[in-house]
Amino acid sequence: METLKKGKKYAIHSLCYLLIILVFIAPIVRLFLMSLKSEEGYSLWNYALLLQEDRTRKAILNTIVIAVGSTAIAAILGSAFAFIIAYTNVRRKRLLELLVLLPFIIPSYIITLSWSSLFSQKGTINQTLSAMGLGKINVYSIAGIILVLGFCNVPIVYMNVIHMLRKIPTDMEWAARTCGYGIGQAMLKINLVQAMPAIISGSILAFLAAIDNFAVPAFLGISSGIPVLSTYIYEKSISFGPNSFSLAATLSVILSVIAVAGTLVEGIFGKKSSGMESIKEDYSVRIPLSSGKRKVLQYGVILFLCIINIVPLISMFTSAFQKNYGVKMTLDQFTTDNFTAIFQNKGVLDAIRNSLMLACGCCIICIVIGTAIAYQKVRHPGRMITLVEKSASLTYAIPGIVLALSMIFHWIEPLPGIRPGIYGTISILMIAYVTRYLILQIKGSATAMLSIHPALEEAAAASGRSVFSVWGKILIPLLIRPVLSSTFMIFVSALTELTLSSMLAAAGTKTIGLMIFNFQQAGDYNLAAAMSVVIVVLVLTGYFLINHKNSEYKKVEERVYESFNRKCNQKVQSNISIGSY
């Protein structure tokens, strides 16, 4: 009997390892092997050939310049906003935080569309500048890409830094003050130094997000002939050259090496700040400003955030209701035909249906599998759980365009002789989405699981409850609020995804992001703007609904704890009564 149990356990473990290798590791290995494949066999010929091309060197240089420039913008603005919101006594902090996080909630290609709408060549701003004898602003340039990417990545640095700032003990500041330091000196000598690992870590994440981003350089760079590695991989993949896929794989490996190296460096700085994870965040005011200074800073920050995050969106909203793109808005120009056109377009309706189906399916799969893995990680850690977490992290760390290409190479024939025929179908998109976003659910569910004491499960099991009852009555009600927060980000990312679908979708499986991209590339800017408006409204509505539901689920958590404590007390009292009897 014991031998049978061991054999069954071994078979289950072997199957799990096989699935991990098949889904996460094998596609990356296939991609690497494809980069070495040439007419003579396996060699470094593809690397030598590509590095000799001027366009390749230009793409690498552009990628580095754009990533460094946008990271500098994100690091400066993200850190500054974090200091202001965490430490000063400015009011409307929830509004300020929403304005800062807006580029994180809205897809980057919609933000790019809004900026291109604001600075269109026939638009009000450029026409005014031209009338004044000044040069027009061109966002279809390296400077434009840097600016838009920098604004898109501000929330990444902000979220990394603000939590660290709130965890720095006030005792350290007061100790510095007693030594004669002023508030400014204490902030520079103590808080800034303590927060530096988080600032560097956030900056590296912003750098990785910049080299991973396909949408911004595709929308602004392809038409103006500015190649970066992500768009260059896309160009090579859709070309029909004899060696196009091998060359695309080679470029993908180069981009992946940069991304993985950055991830490892970020991990080093992340560990330096991980020692403060157990410290509770302090929301007290540390830099009290006078009423006048507070108002100037508060309204100045709100104005600046509105200029970089709201004004471009308003311009895009205006374009969605215009007959002609890029001209001054007048009553003669007002129309709702753009919205009528997109909702009567079968391709658009199919894309919305596909995206909703993929987003919902991806969320359900990630919740079930991700939460199960997180439970095992927290309660029963082991080598298999570590392997699946590392593998899922790898597929999230590499750029999306690289993952998409690896999916093509792998799933055409995942095992020798087996051809599932899923390329160009919803199935390969679903596999790619789950592979891409599973780690977000694992980390979110693991964090939520850590907040639930094992004693709750042990007490429930001791009282005779089944595993299903423990999950249904205790774990799920306590997990649902934090788990839903992670799931919402997966849902929005999957719903508005562009990079994976640009490589994996076919005529009948186009997604929302791909339709907007196609409209923009075809010059149908008004239709792209109209569809983007619909997506922005849907995403923001979902964001506010999730926040509202989170407050309701918090009350449910409190009721679960109260109910459980009451039943435990009754059980104890009952045992005492029986014992005394």
Where are these regions (language model features)?
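P-loop potassium selectivity filter motif centered on the GYG triad
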Residues: 47, 230, 238, 339-341, ...
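Peri-membrane helix termini and adjoining interfacial loops of integral membrane proteins
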Residues: 36-44, 120-132, 222-232, 273-281, ...
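Glycine-rich helix-loop "coupling/hinge" segments at transmembrane-helix boundaries
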Residues: 117, 215-242, 328-332, 498-525, ...
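C-terminal transmembrane helix and the adjacent membrane-cytosol boundary/short C-terminal tail
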Residues: 2-15, 92-93, 162-177, 183-184, ...
